[in-house]
Amino acid sequence: MSYLIKNSKITHFLTYRFLFCLFLISLTSCKTDKKLLTAQQIIDNSIKVSGVDKVHNSTLSFNFRDKKYIAERNSGVFVLKRISAMKDLQIEDQLSNQGFQRLINSRASMVADSMAVKYIESINSVHYFSVLPYGLNDNAVQKKLLKSTIIKGKKYYKVQITFNEDGGGVDFDDVFIYWIGAEDFKIDYLAYTFHVNGGGMRFREVRKEHLIEGTRLLDYNNFKPKDTNTKLSDLDKAFENNKLIKASEINLENIKITFN
């Protein structure tokens, strides 16, 4: 009788050990899977979670500072507009697959090439940031996964974005870094270099999210480094250590979106 009881205890013990080992293997496997995500997979997940994949066929309008912006997208065909009013004049700048044009009171107006380049940069920049991470799967985009980091106690994937010269636009040599939540795949921070107006770096912190028709659009606090020698990849550390200066706020207002 005691022999049977002893064997029963051994059997239960071995069964427990076996199940516990299976649990550890499963847990380790899950953690390993997360570590093995590629930059492409992380961006894909972020686009899906943010709902901006639907922007591909939509009309989006919003106000930014003193201008109105409208983006019409239809399966790769796009028209990006910036509209401003001055007294009796309405100026509408358009950037599309066909190029750039300016309309003044609905009539085409000539623009010097040197000025057109500046207008294109400005229009493209506002529309680009307004729907992030949409656009991060464009053909010209190159993705690189950097070392994960923690900001304010939250773990982030760190993805660097660069662009091919062919298809990367006039600012193809800009570099971006996105901090994407390791659990929720939301962009909470981003940083970038720029070369216009003397160049520099900026670090953006999401200050508010707008959920419009299932699409996550963002407002930001915009920072610049106190030390101009700070590396772009170290701006997250500079942010945590209060070594950034708030330069501005990026707020989208009167947001409307309809899907085709």
Name what the model sees in each region.
Residues S46, A71-R73, R207-E209:
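Extended lipid/amphipathic-ligand handling interfaces
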Residues Y157-I257:
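Gly/Pro-enriched, hydrophobic low-complexity segments
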Residues K34-Q41, R102-F172, N197:
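Flexible, processing/modification-adjacent segments and terminal tails
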Residues K81-V117:
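Mid-chain, structured segments of secreted extracytoplasmic proteins
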Residues M1-A39:
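Bacterial Sec-dependent N-terminal signal peptides
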